[in-house]
Amino acid sequence: NDKGVWKVYSDILNADVLIASAVGHLVEKDNPYKNYENWELENLPALPEKFSYKVKKGVSYSFNNIKKCIRECDFIIIGTDPDREGESIAYKILNEIPGSINKVKYRLWANSLTKKGIESAFKKLRDPSETINYYHEADARDDADWLVGFNLSPFVTIKMKEVGELEKTDKVMSVGRVQTPIVSLIVRNHEEIENFVSVPFWTIEALNEEGLKFTNDVKYKSLQEATEALELMSDSYTVIDVKVENKSQTAPKLYNLTNLQSEMSKLYKVDATRTKEIVQSLYQKGFMSYPRTDSTLITTNEFEYLVANIERYKQTIGKDIETVNLIPRKEFVNDKKVVEHYAIIPTENIPNIEELDSYEKIIYQMVTFQTLLMFSENYDYQSTTITIKNDASSVEFKVSGNVTINKGWRKYKQTKSEDKELPSLNVADNLVLKANIKQDQTKPPSRITEQYLLKTLLPKYDLGTS
Protein backbone atom coordinates (compact mmCIF):
# COMPACT_ATOMS: atom_id res chain seq x y z
CA ASN A 1 0.00 0.00 0.00
CA ASP A 2 1.70 3.18 -1.21
CA LYS A 3 -0.30 6.23 -0.10
CA GLY A 4 -3.69 4.83 -1.03
CA VAL A 5 -2.60 2.77 -4.04
CA TRP A 6 -2.17 -0.99 -3.67
CA LYS A 7 0.42 -2.69 -5.85
CA VAL A 8 -0.06 -6.44 -6.29
CA TYR A 9 0.72 -9.26 -8.69
CA SER A 10 -2.32 -11.14 -10.00
CA ASP A 11 -1.99 -14.83 -10.87
CA ILE A 12 -5.37 -14.71 -12.58
CA LEU A 13 -4.38 -11.78 -14.82
CA ASN A 14 -0.71 -12.75 -14.94
CA ALA A 15 0.16 -9.10 -14.49
CA ASP A 16 1.18 -6.42 -12.03
CA VAL A 17 -1.91 -4.55 -10.85
CA LEU A 18 -2.43 -1.09 -9.34
CA ILE A 19 -5.57 -0.79 -7.22
CA ALA A 20 -6.92 2.68 -6.38
CA SER A 21 -10.09 3.32 -4.42
CA ALA A 22 -12.64 5.93 -5.48
CA VAL A 23 -14.07 6.27 -1.93
CA GLY A 24 -17.49 7.09 -3.38
CA HIS A 25 -18.32 9.97 -5.73
CA LEU A 26 -15.25 12.06 -6.49
CA VAL A 27 -16.88 14.11 -9.25
CA GLU A 28 -20.02 16.24 -9.13
CA LYS A 29 -22.02 18.52 -11.42
CA ASP A 30 -20.65 22.02 -11.82
CA ASN A 31 -23.57 24.44 -11.56
CA PRO A 32 -23.96 25.91 -15.07
CA TYR A 33 -25.74 28.93 -13.60
CA LYS A 34 -23.34 30.13 -10.91
CA ASN A 35 -24.49 33.75 -11.19
CA TYR A 36 -28.04 32.90 -12.16
CA GLU A 37 -30.95 33.82 -9.91
CA ASN A 38 -33.38 30.93 -10.25
CA TRP A 39 -35.66 32.34 -7.57
CA GLU A 40 -37.20 34.75 -10.07
CA LEU A 41 -40.01 33.39 -12.25
CA GLU A 42 -38.76 35.21 -15.36
CA ASN A 43 -35.52 33.18 -15.15
CA LEU A 44 -37.33 29.85 -15.26
CA PRO A 45 -37.08 27.31 -16.70
CA ALA A 46 -33.30 26.90 -16.71
CA LEU A 47 -32.33 24.25 -19.28
CA PRO A 48 -28.59 23.94 -19.88
CA GLU A 49 -27.56 22.40 -23.20
CA LYS A 50 -24.79 20.43 -21.53
CA PHE A 51 -23.58 19.73 -18.00
CA SER A 52 -19.95 20.01 -16.94
CA TYR A 53 -18.35 18.35 -13.93
CA LYS A 54 -15.71 19.11 -11.33
CA VAL A 55 -13.77 17.21 -8.68
CA LYS A 56 -15.50 17.53 -5.31
CA LYS A 57 -13.82 19.43 -2.50
CA GLY A 58 -11.77 17.29 -0.13
CA VAL A 59 -11.24 14.32 -2.47
CA SER A 60 -8.59 15.64 -4.86
CA TYR A 61 -5.99 13.32 -3.30
CA SER A 62 -8.00 10.21 -4.21
CA PHE A 63 -8.76 11.61 -7.67
CA ASN A 64 -5.09 12.33 -8.35
CA ASN A 65 -4.14 8.83 -7.18
CA ILE A 66 -6.48 7.34 -9.77
CA LYS A 67 -5.24 9.76 -12.42
CA LYS A 68 -1.62 8.77 -11.75
CA CYS A 69 -2.45 5.04 -11.89
CA ILE A 70 -4.24 5.48 -15.22
CA ARG A 71 -1.22 7.22 -16.71
CA GLU A 72 1.03 4.33 -15.65
CA CYS A 73 -1.23 1.41 -16.62
CA ASP A 74 -1.73 -0.43 -19.92
CA PHE A 75 -5.45 -1.00 -19.42
CA ILE A 76 -8.20 -0.38 -16.86
CA ILE A 77 -10.51 -2.77 -15.03
CA ILE A 78 -13.49 -0.97 -13.50
CA GLY A 79 -14.15 -2.52 -10.09
CA THR A 80 -16.72 -0.21 -8.49
CA ASP A 81 -19.99 -1.55 -7.06
CA PRO A 82 -21.90 -3.67 -9.58
CA ASP A 83 -24.85 -1.33 -10.12
CA ARG A 84 -25.88 1.98 -11.69
CA GLU A 85 -24.28 4.07 -8.98
CA GLY A 86 -21.00 2.16 -9.17
CA GLU A 87 -20.93 2.53 -12.94
CA SER A 88 -21.65 6.25 -12.59
CA ILE A 89 -18.85 6.76 -10.05
CA ALA A 90 -16.35 5.12 -12.40
CA TYR A 91 -17.25 6.83 -15.65
CA LYS A 92 -17.64 10.29 -14.14
CA ILE A 93 -14.07 9.99 -12.86
CA LEU A 94 -12.78 8.58 -16.15
CA ASN A 95 -14.49 11.34 -18.15
CA GLU A 96 -12.41 13.90 -16.24
CA ILE A 97 -9.10 12.16 -17.06
CA PRO A 98 -8.09 12.60 -20.74
CA GLY A 99 -7.36 9.35 -22.57
CA SER A 100 -8.69 7.10 -19.82
CA ILE A 101 -11.86 5.89 -21.55
CA ASN A 102 -9.82 4.28 -24.33
CA LYS A 103 -7.92 2.25 -21.72
CA VAL A 104 -11.04 0.64 -20.22
CA LYS A 105 -10.79 -3.06 -21.11
CA TYR A 106 -12.78 -5.01 -18.49
CA ARG A 107 -15.54 -4.65 -15.93
CA LEU A 108 -15.25 -6.57 -12.64
CA TRP A 109 -18.78 -7.54 -11.57
CA ALA A 110 -18.60 -8.97 -8.04
CA ASN A 111 -21.81 -9.81 -6.19
CA SER A 112 -19.83 -11.18 -3.25
CA LEU A 113 -16.76 -9.78 -1.53
CA THR A 114 -15.51 -13.12 -0.23
CA LYS A 115 -12.19 -14.36 -1.57
CA LYS A 116 -13.97 -16.98 -3.69
CA GLY A 117 -16.52 -14.44 -4.90
CA ILE A 118 -13.86 -11.97 -6.01
CA GLU A 119 -11.71 -14.68 -7.61
CA SER A 120 -14.75 -15.93 -9.50
CA ALA A 121 -15.54 -12.41 -10.71
CA PHE A 122 -11.94 -11.91 -11.90
CA LYS A 123 -12.16 -15.15 -13.85
CA LYS A 124 -15.34 -13.85 -15.53
CA LEU A 125 -14.35 -10.27 -16.33
CA ARG A 126 -16.99 -8.62 -18.48
CA ASP A 127 -16.75 -6.45 -21.55
CA PRO A 128 -17.44 -2.83 -20.49
CA SER A 129 -20.03 -2.53 -23.28
CA GLU A 130 -22.23 -4.98 -21.35
CA THR A 131 -22.61 -2.64 -18.39
CA ILE A 132 -22.01 0.92 -19.61
CA ASN A 133 -25.74 1.50 -20.09
CA TYR A 134 -26.03 1.44 -16.30
CA TYR A 135 -23.90 4.59 -16.35
CA HIS A 136 -26.11 6.17 -19.00
CA GLU A 137 -29.19 5.34 -16.91
CA ALA A 138 -27.65 6.81 -13.77
CA ASP A 139 -26.47 9.88 -15.68
CA ALA A 140 -29.92 10.47 -17.20
CA ARG A 141 -31.52 10.12 -13.78
CA ASP A 142 -28.99 12.54 -12.28
CA ASP A 143 -29.73 15.10 -15.01
CA ALA A 144 -33.47 14.70 -14.50
CA ASP A 145 -33.13 15.13 -10.74
CA TRP A 146 -31.08 18.30 -11.22
CA LEU A 147 -33.56 19.80 -13.69
CA VAL A 148 -36.55 18.99 -11.48
CA GLY A 149 -34.92 20.37 -8.34
CA PHE A 150 -33.35 23.48 -9.88
CA ASN A 151 -36.54 24.52 -11.67
CA LEU A 152 -39.52 23.20 -9.76
CA SER A 153 -38.33 23.80 -6.19
CA PRO A 154 -38.18 27.61 -6.67
CA PHE A 155 -41.25 27.65 -8.92
CA VAL A 156 -43.45 25.76 -6.45
CA THR A 157 -42.05 27.73 -3.49
CA ILE A 158 -42.82 31.07 -5.16
CA LYS A 159 -46.34 29.97 -6.13
CA MET A 160 -47.10 28.62 -2.65
CA LYS A 161 -45.96 31.87 -1.05
CA GLU A 162 -48.18 33.82 -3.45
CA VAL A 163 -51.26 31.98 -2.16
CA GLY A 164 -50.15 32.05 1.47
CA GLU A 165 -49.27 28.35 1.80
CA LEU A 166 -45.70 29.18 2.89
CA GLU A 167 -45.73 31.99 5.42
CA LYS A 168 -42.07 32.19 6.41
CA THR A 169 -39.92 34.07 3.92
CA ASP A 170 -37.05 31.60 4.31
CA LYS A 171 -39.18 28.48 3.92
CA VAL A 172 -38.65 26.37 0.79
CA MET A 173 -40.80 23.64 -0.73
CA SER A 174 -38.36 21.08 -2.06
CA VAL A 175 -39.52 19.22 -5.17
CA GLY A 176 -38.01 15.89 -6.22
CA ARG A 177 -38.63 13.13 -8.74
CA VAL A 178 -39.31 10.56 -5.99
CA GLN A 179 -39.95 12.60 -2.84
CA THR A 180 -42.80 14.70 -4.26
CA PRO A 181 -44.98 11.77 -5.42
CA ILE A 182 -44.38 10.10 -2.04
CA VAL A 183 -45.36 13.27 -0.16
CA SER A 184 -48.43 13.52 -2.39
CA LEU A 185 -49.48 9.96 -1.53
CA ILE A 186 -48.99 10.61 2.19
CA VAL A 187 -50.94 13.89 2.06
CA ARG A 188 -53.76 12.26 0.09
CA ASN A 189 -53.89 9.43 2.62
CA HIS A 190 -53.98 11.95 5.50
CA GLU A 191 -56.79 13.92 3.87
CA GLU A 192 -58.82 10.76 3.22
CA ILE A 193 -58.52 9.86 6.91
CA GLU A 194 -59.31 13.41 8.09
CA ASN A 195 -62.35 13.71 5.82
CA PHE A 196 -63.61 10.18 6.38
CA VAL A 197 -67.13 9.87 7.72
CA SER A 198 -67.92 6.46 9.17
CA VAL A 199 -71.20 5.01 7.93
CA PRO A 200 -73.05 2.13 9.61
CA PHE A 201 -74.05 -0.93 7.64
CA TRP A 202 -75.71 -4.24 8.42
CA THR A 203 -74.99 -7.78 7.25
CA ILE A 204 -76.71 -11.13 7.75
CA GLU A 205 -74.88 -14.25 8.91
CA ALA A 206 -76.09 -17.77 9.55
CA LEU A 207 -74.74 -19.97 12.38
CA ASN A 208 -75.08 -23.65 13.19
CA GLU A 209 -75.34 -25.02 16.74
CA GLU A 210 -71.54 -25.22 17.06
CA GLY A 211 -71.18 -21.53 16.18
CA LEU A 212 -69.77 -22.06 12.69
CA LYS A 213 -70.47 -18.86 10.78
CA PHE A 214 -71.67 -18.71 7.18
CA THR A 215 -71.41 -15.17 5.77
CA ASN A 216 -73.06 -13.16 3.02
CA ASP A 217 -71.37 -10.22 1.27
CA VAL A 218 -74.43 -7.99 0.93
CA LYS A 219 -74.18 -4.78 2.99
CA TYR A 220 -77.54 -3.27 3.91
CA LYS A 221 -77.75 0.50 4.37
CA SER A 222 -80.30 0.36 7.18
CA LEU A 223 -81.45 -1.97 9.92
CA GLN A 224 -84.92 -1.95 8.38
CA GLU A 225 -83.55 -3.12 5.02
CA ALA A 226 -81.61 -5.95 6.72
CA THR A 227 -84.64 -6.90 8.83
CA GLU A 228 -86.86 -7.11 5.76
CA ALA A 229 -84.33 -9.40 4.07
CA LEU A 230 -84.07 -11.57 7.20
CA GLU A 231 -87.86 -11.93 7.42
CA LEU A 232 -87.87 -13.51 3.96
CA MET A 233 -85.53 -16.27 5.13
CA SER A 234 -86.34 -19.59 6.73
CA ASP A 235 -84.13 -21.73 8.98
CA SER A 236 -83.67 -24.28 6.19
CA TYR A 237 -80.62 -24.22 3.92
CA THR A 238 -79.30 -26.45 1.15
CA VAL A 239 -75.65 -27.05 0.25
CA ILE A 240 -75.20 -26.02 -3.39
CA ASP A 241 -71.43 -26.28 -3.75
CA VAL A 242 -68.48 -27.86 -1.95
CA LYS A 243 -65.06 -26.96 -3.32
CA VAL A 244 -62.10 -28.89 -1.89
CA GLU A 245 -58.57 -28.20 -3.09
CA ASN A 246 -55.27 -29.67 -1.96
CA LYS A 247 -52.73 -26.86 -1.99
CA SER A 248 -49.01 -26.58 -1.44
CA GLN A 249 -47.14 -23.41 -0.51
CA THR A 250 -43.39 -22.99 -0.84
CA ALA A 251 -41.38 -21.09 1.73
CA PRO A 252 -41.32 -17.27 1.52
CA LYS A 253 -39.20 -15.73 -1.22
CA LEU A 254 -35.57 -14.91 -0.58
CA TYR A 255 -34.98 -11.32 0.45
CA ASN A 256 -34.35 -8.42 -1.86
CA LEU A 257 -33.47 -5.06 -0.33
CA THR A 258 -37.03 -3.69 -0.30
CA ASN A 259 -38.51 -6.77 1.38
CA LEU A 260 -35.74 -6.80 3.97
CA GLN A 261 -36.22 -3.09 4.69
CA SER A 262 -39.97 -3.64 5.01
CA GLU A 263 -39.56 -6.50 7.48
CA MET A 264 -36.99 -4.62 9.56
CA SER A 265 -39.38 -1.67 9.75
CA LYS A 266 -42.26 -3.92 10.79
CA LEU A 267 -40.43 -6.07 13.33
CA TYR A 268 -37.77 -3.73 14.74
CA LYS A 269 -38.83 -0.19 13.73
CA VAL A 270 -35.53 0.24 11.88
CA ASP A 271 -35.85 2.69 8.98
CA ALA A 272 -34.97 1.84 5.39
CA THR A 273 -31.76 3.87 5.28
CA ARG A 274 -30.36 2.26 8.42
CA THR A 275 -31.23 -1.23 7.16
CA LYS A 276 -29.40 -0.54 3.89
CA GLU A 277 -26.35 0.67 5.82
CA ILE A 278 -26.30 -2.49 7.97
CA VAL A 279 -26.60 -4.84 4.99
CA GLN A 280 -23.92 -2.85 3.19
CA SER A 281 -21.65 -3.30 6.21
CA LEU A 282 -22.23 -7.07 6.20
CA TYR A 283 -21.51 -7.12 2.46
CA GLN A 284 -18.26 -5.20 2.89
CA LYS A 285 -17.22 -7.63 5.62
CA GLY A 286 -17.80 -10.48 3.17
CA PHE A 287 -20.68 -12.11 5.07
CA MET A 288 -23.58 -11.10 2.83
CA SER A 289 -24.15 -10.93 -0.91
CA TYR A 290 -24.59 -7.64 -2.76
CA PRO A 291 -27.40 -5.71 -1.01
CA ARG A 292 -28.85 -3.29 -3.56
CA THR A 293 -30.84 -5.87 -5.47
CA ASP A 294 -34.49 -6.18 -6.44
CA SER A 295 -34.24 -9.90 -7.24
CA THR A 296 -35.60 -12.68 -5.03
CA LEU A 297 -33.89 -15.40 -7.09
CA ILE A 298 -30.43 -16.95 -7.14
CA THR A 299 -28.53 -19.02 -9.71
CA THR A 300 -27.38 -22.63 -9.46
CA ASN A 301 -23.89 -21.38 -8.51
CA GLU A 302 -25.17 -19.78 -5.31
CA PHE A 303 -27.49 -22.71 -4.61
CA GLU A 304 -24.57 -25.14 -4.71
CA TYR A 305 -22.46 -23.26 -2.17
CA LEU A 306 -25.50 -22.75 0.08
CA VAL A 307 -26.16 -26.51 0.07
CA ALA A 308 -22.52 -27.16 0.92
CA ASN A 309 -22.76 -24.86 3.96
CA ILE A 310 -26.25 -25.72 5.26
CA GLU A 311 -25.11 -27.29 8.51
CA ARG A 312 -22.74 -24.41 9.27
CA TYR A 313 -25.53 -21.89 8.71
CA LYS A 314 -27.85 -23.83 11.03
CA GLN A 315 -25.21 -23.95 13.73
CA THR A 316 -24.36 -20.26 13.37
CA ILE A 317 -27.93 -18.99 13.82
CA GLY A 318 -29.03 -21.80 16.16
CA LYS A 319 -31.90 -23.09 14.01
CA ASP A 320 -32.44 -26.83 13.56
CA ILE A 321 -34.41 -26.61 10.32
CA GLU A 322 -35.19 -29.81 8.44
CA THR A 323 -33.63 -29.20 5.03
CA VAL A 324 -34.89 -31.74 2.51
CA ASN A 325 -35.20 -29.82 -0.78
CA LEU A 326 -31.62 -30.03 -1.97
CA ILE A 327 -32.50 -29.80 -5.67
CA PRO A 328 -32.98 -26.29 -7.14
CA ARG A 329 -36.63 -25.23 -7.47
CA LYS A 330 -37.86 -22.57 -9.90
CA GLU A 331 -39.43 -20.50 -7.13
CA PHE A 332 -35.93 -19.74 -5.83
CA VAL A 333 -33.37 -20.66 -8.51
CA ASN A 334 -33.49 -19.43 -12.09
CA ASP A 335 -30.29 -18.81 -14.03
CA LYS A 336 -32.12 -17.07 -16.90
CA LYS A 337 -34.03 -14.58 -14.74
CA VAL A 338 -31.04 -13.46 -12.67
CA VAL A 339 -29.73 -10.84 -15.06
CA GLU A 340 -27.31 -8.94 -12.83
CA HIS A 341 -27.82 -9.28 -9.06
CA TYR A 342 -29.28 -12.22 -7.20
CA ALA A 343 -31.22 -12.18 -3.92
CA ILE A 344 -29.64 -11.22 -0.59
CA ILE A 345 -28.17 -14.39 0.90
CA PRO A 346 -25.29 -15.30 3.23
CA THR A 347 -21.94 -15.92 1.60
CA GLU A 348 -19.77 -18.97 2.21
CA ASN A 349 -17.72 -16.72 4.51
CA ILE A 350 -19.52 -17.38 7.81
CA PRO A 351 -18.95 -15.00 10.75
CA ASN A 352 -18.63 -15.57 14.46
CA ILE A 353 -22.09 -14.17 15.05
CA GLU A 354 -21.24 -12.92 18.53
CA GLU A 355 -18.70 -10.54 17.01
CA LEU A 356 -21.38 -8.73 15.00
CA ASP A 357 -23.12 -5.71 16.48
CA SER A 358 -26.75 -6.09 17.56
CA TYR A 359 -28.46 -5.09 14.31
CA GLU A 360 -25.88 -6.81 12.11
CA LYS A 361 -26.63 -9.95 14.10
CA ILE A 362 -30.40 -9.53 13.64
CA ILE A 363 -30.14 -9.02 9.88
CA TYR A 364 -27.63 -11.82 9.41
CA GLN A 365 -29.93 -14.19 11.29
CA MET A 366 -33.00 -13.04 9.34
CA VAL A 367 -31.35 -13.45 5.94
CA THR A 368 -29.75 -16.78 6.79
CA PHE A 369 -32.98 -18.12 8.30
CA GLN A 370 -34.97 -17.08 5.22
CA THR A 371 -32.36 -18.76 3.03
CA LEU A 372 -32.54 -22.02 5.01
CA LEU A 373 -36.34 -22.08 4.71
CA MET A 374 -35.83 -22.49 0.96
CA PHE A 375 -34.60 -26.03 1.67
CA SER A 376 -37.51 -27.00 3.95
CA GLU A 377 -40.70 -28.84 3.03
CA ASN A 378 -43.71 -27.10 1.55
CA TYR A 379 -46.69 -26.20 3.69
CA ASP A 380 -49.42 -28.56 2.48
CA TYR A 381 -53.05 -27.97 3.33
CA GLN A 382 -56.59 -28.69 2.22
CA SER A 383 -58.69 -25.64 1.37
CA THR A 384 -62.47 -26.03 1.53
CA THR A 385 -65.24 -23.59 0.59
CA ILE A 386 -68.87 -24.52 1.25
CA THR A 387 -71.70 -22.54 -0.36
CA ILE A 388 -75.28 -22.83 0.91
CA LYS A 389 -78.59 -21.28 -0.17
CA ASN A 390 -81.54 -20.30 1.96
CA ASP A 391 -84.50 -22.42 0.89
CA ALA A 392 -87.01 -19.57 1.21
CA SER A 393 -85.15 -16.52 -0.15
CA SER A 394 -82.37 -18.12 -2.27
CA VAL A 395 -79.78 -15.87 -0.55
CA GLU A 396 -76.35 -17.54 -0.63
CA PHE A 397 -73.87 -17.85 2.25
CA LYS A 398 -70.31 -19.18 2.32
CA VAL A 399 -67.74 -20.48 4.76
CA SER A 400 -64.09 -21.29 4.05
CA GLY A 401 -61.41 -23.07 6.00
CA ASN A 402 -58.02 -24.73 5.73
CA VAL A 403 -56.86 -27.96 7.28
CA THR A 404 -53.10 -28.50 7.59
CA ILE A 405 -51.74 -31.70 6.10
CA ASN A 406 -48.03 -30.93 6.57
CA LYS A 407 -46.77 -27.78 8.32
CA GLY A 408 -43.47 -27.87 6.42
CA TRP A 409 -41.64 -24.54 6.65
CA ARG A 410 -44.40 -23.14 8.88
CA LYS A 411 -43.01 -25.22 11.72
CA TYR A 412 -40.17 -22.70 11.86
CA LYS A 413 -41.70 -19.37 10.79
CA GLN A 414 -44.67 -18.11 12.75
CA THR A 415 -47.65 -17.10 10.64
CA LYS A 416 -51.25 -16.35 11.39
CA SER A 417 -53.09 -19.67 11.52
CA GLU A 418 -55.82 -20.05 8.91
CA ASP A 419 -56.89 -23.50 10.04
CA LYS A 420 -60.62 -23.97 10.48
CA GLU A 421 -62.23 -27.37 10.78
CA LEU A 422 -65.38 -27.56 8.62
CA PRO A 423 -68.13 -30.17 8.85
CA SER A 424 -68.18 -32.91 6.20
CA LEU A 425 -70.92 -31.81 3.81
CA ASN A 426 -72.03 -32.76 0.32
CA VAL A 427 -74.06 -30.98 -2.33
CA ALA A 428 -77.84 -31.24 -1.65
CA ASP A 429 -77.35 -31.76 2.10
CA ASN A 430 -79.92 -29.92 4.20
CA LEU A 431 -78.99 -27.71 7.15
CA VAL A 432 -80.87 -25.94 9.89
CA LEU A 433 -79.21 -22.63 10.77
CA LYS A 434 -80.06 -19.54 12.76
CA ALA A 435 -79.62 -16.28 10.82
CA ASN A 436 -79.08 -12.98 12.57
CA ILE A 437 -78.21 -9.39 11.78
CA LYS A 438 -74.79 -7.93 12.52
CA GLN A 439 -74.08 -4.19 12.63
CA ASP A 440 -70.71 -2.73 11.61
CA GLN A 441 -69.13 0.57 10.57
CA THR A 442 -67.09 1.54 7.54
CA LYS A 443 -63.49 2.22 8.56
CA PRO A 444 -61.07 4.92 7.40
CA PRO A 445 -57.97 4.01 5.40
CA SER A 446 -54.98 2.96 7.48
CA ARG A 447 -52.11 5.38 7.91
CA ILE A 448 -49.24 4.82 5.51
CA THR A 449 -46.41 3.19 7.42
CA GLU A 450 -42.83 2.84 6.24
CA GLN A 451 -43.43 -0.89 5.81
CA TYR A 452 -46.50 -0.30 3.62
CA LEU A 453 -44.64 2.38 1.69
CA LEU A 454 -41.70 0.06 0.97
CA LYS A 455 -43.60 -3.14 0.33
CA THR A 456 -46.68 -1.87 -1.50
CA LEU A 457 -46.70 1.77 -2.62
CA LEU A 458 -43.18 2.17 -4.04
CA PRO A 459 -43.41 -0.99 -6.20
CA LYS A 460 -46.99 -0.11 -7.23
CA TYR A 461 -46.01 3.32 -8.58
CA ASP A 462 -42.45 2.32 -9.54
CA LEU A 463 -40.97 4.96 -7.26
CA GLY A 464 -37.37 4.74 -6.14
CA THR A 465 -37.23 1.04 -7.00
CA SER A 466 -34.34 1.20 -9.43
Q: What do the PLM-derived regions correspond to, one by one?
A:
Residues T131, Y135-H136, D145-N151, T157, ...:
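Extended, highly charged linker/hinge segments and catalytic-adjacent loops that couple domains
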Residues N1, P291, N325, Y379-S383, ...:
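GHKL-family ATPase ATP-binding module
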Residues F51, G58, N64-E72, L113-N208, ...:
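C-terminal or mid-to-C-terminal helical accessory/interaction module adjacent to the motor/catalytic core
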Residues I12-K56, E165, T169-Q280, Q284, ...:
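Long, highly charged, low-complexity internal segments
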Residues N1-F150:
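Intrinsically disordered, low-complexity regulatory segments
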Residues E96-I101, R126, N151, F155, ...:
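A generic secondary-structure signal for well-formed alpha-helical elements
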Residues N111-G117, K161, L257-T258, I278-M288:
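Short, conserved phosphate-binding/catalytic loop or strand-edge motifs used
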Residues T80-P82, S262, R292:
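Short glycine-centered, acidic/aromatic-flanked micro-motifs in structured strand/loop junctions
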